[in-house]
């Protein structure tokens, strides 16, 4: 493959979020890129045997898809919880899931009757159980939490039931089997705690933790106690489905001699827990063939704070927490801290790439100064922006998005850069910076009058303004953009979540009068 001749992807690839059992349903996580989109990008920009890196690895979608495509995957994340999920799902060492099912039956023999007894127990009986099981220390939680201490996240019944299952898992002698059983247990924890918000009008079990929707430890006003063993059994079934899928792909590749070659996680997957801005010491300059990454979006999610629920009980210690690239959180990181971490991480990505290789960064935020950090960091290292695609996240929207539909960005921008053999000079238009109105007048005619999403316009404006050195003129809030669109005769369709051109004569006259 001649990397210089690769035509960049210039179209949005629709998400197929539920097609892969290895990612969908096996374990919740804060953000997760659609695996079919990631897979398409990895396949397009790299070859079998290439080194593919994700410096902000999360739940491992990039690394797992790269490994299954025969690449050598490097997954990096400061969060041990993220690395645990990735390692467990990706592991190809089992011959089949027969041993795993047998291990699950052994867990049932050790604790099933005790767990069922807990579900019927009185308060006095529950106290007796809690005094005789191994529990983690009752540590203090982040200030933003509704609960002050760790145990406050659970009802006594949930705490006792989860402890009984984990104690039974901990005596499993096989490390690989124990890790997969803990993955199912860990996924159960997400449902068996007081942050679980049951979906109204649906079965009690249909819902999710506020940790993954509101992004804080918000306790439910109506506590739901789901059946403990059945919840664990259901999560285990999802782990079995994920592992069967991984092993089928492995066996097909290894038996048929598919282009990606033999798949072996021990040879093809490396898990790191480093500061993304300091990977050079671990990997070396010009050592990577492709990078696909999704850095944190400012202060949206305090990943390490919100992972205490799992890291603490699983016994994982968090190193380098002061290197987390976020705004706020328990350590109250400043915006300057975030921008510095983002800038250094992106610059490091370009340095890690071999010449004539590609980098894709997924990002979205109303604060265009964050985009400027990314775009400038790549340009300063000699990289060239080749594609900027808006990915429409066609998923169930958060409550915040539903209530503020026209002001919240629901999609993301996929920025793809190329690192030439010779360092590129920063070449951008030096003409007079364009105002917001000038940018709107230039880019609106190119959008369909039948409708477009806010993020589609915003992303076009962002790239256009950066190329004209005018990003500072986009430092406006969402309301101002909405007002400018209405002045030009556009209306927001709250049902379809798109802007439509109002072609009525009265609306056109009103729009002209407002201007």
Language model segments and positions:
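Charged low-complexity interaction tracts in eukaryotic proteins
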Residues: 428-430, 472-515
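Core SAM-dependent methyltransferase catalytic element
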Residues: 354-358, 377, 381, 403-423, ...
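A short glycine-rich, Lys/Arg-flanked "PGG" loop and its adjoining helix->strand segment in the class I
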Residues: 339-355, 380
């Amino acid at each position: 493959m001649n990397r210089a001749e690769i035509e960049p992807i210039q179209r949005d690839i629709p998400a197929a979020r539920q097609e892969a059992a290895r990612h969908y349903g096996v374990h919740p996580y804060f953000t997760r890129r659609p695996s079919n989109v990631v897979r398409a990008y990895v396949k397009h920009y790299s070859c079998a045997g290439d080194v593919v890196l994700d410096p902000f690895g999360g739940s491992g979608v990039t690394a797992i898809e790269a490994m299954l495509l025969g690449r050598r995957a490097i997954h990096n994340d400061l969060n041990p919880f993220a690395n645990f999920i990735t390692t467990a799902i990706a592991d190809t060492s089992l011959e089949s899931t027969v041993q795993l099912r047998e291990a699950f039956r052994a867990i049932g023999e050790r604790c099933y009757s005790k767990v069922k007894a807990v579900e019927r127990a009185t308060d006095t009986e529950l106290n007796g159980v809690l005094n005789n099981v191994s529990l983690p220390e009752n540590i203090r939680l982040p200030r933003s939490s509704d609960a002050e201490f760790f145990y406050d996240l659970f009802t006594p019944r949930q705490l006792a039931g989860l402890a009984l299952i984990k104690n039974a898992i901990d005596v499993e002698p096989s490390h690989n089997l124990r890790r997969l059983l803990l993955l199912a247990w860990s996924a159960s924890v997400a449902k068996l705690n007081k942050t679980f918000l049951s979906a109204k009008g649906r079965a009690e079990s249909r819902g999710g933790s506020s940790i993954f929707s509101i992004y804080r430890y918000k306790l439910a006003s109506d506590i739901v106690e789901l059946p403990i063993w059945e919840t664990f059994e259901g999560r285990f079934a999802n782990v079995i489905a994920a592992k069967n899928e991984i092993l089928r792909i492995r066996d097909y590749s290894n038996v048929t001699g598919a282009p990606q070659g033999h798949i072996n996680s021990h040879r093809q997957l490396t898990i790191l827990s480093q500061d993304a801005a300091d990977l050079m010491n671990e990997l070396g300059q010009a050592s990577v063939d492709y990078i696909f990454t999704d850095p944190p979006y400012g202060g949206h999610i305090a990943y390490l704070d919100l992972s205490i629920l799992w890291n603490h009980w699983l016994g994982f210690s968090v190193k380098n927490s002061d290197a987390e690239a976020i705004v706020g959180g328990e350590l109250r990181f400043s915006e300057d801290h975030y921008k510095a971490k983002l800038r250094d991480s992106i610059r490091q990505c370009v340095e890690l790439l071999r010449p004539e290789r590609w980098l894709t960064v997924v990002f979205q935020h109303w604060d265009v100064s964050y985009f400027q950090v990314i775009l400038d960091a790549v340009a300063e290292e000699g990289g060239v922006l080749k594609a900027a695609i808006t990915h429409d996240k066609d998923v169930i929207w958060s409550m915040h998005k539903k209530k503020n539909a026209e002001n919240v960005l629901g999609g993301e921008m996929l920025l793809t850069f190329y690192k030439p053999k010779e360092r590129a000079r920063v070449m951008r238009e030096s003409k007079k910076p364009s105002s917001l109105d000038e940018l709107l007048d230039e880019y609106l005619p190119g959008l369909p009058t039948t409708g477009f999403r806010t993020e589609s316009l915003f992303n076009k404006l962002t790239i256009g303004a950066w190329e004209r050195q005018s990003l500072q003129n986009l430092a406006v809030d969402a309301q101002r953009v909405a007002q400018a669109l209405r002045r030009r005769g556009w209306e927001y369709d709250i049902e379809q979540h798109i802007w439509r051109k109002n072609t009525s004569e009265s609306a056109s006259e009103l729009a002209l009068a407002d201007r």
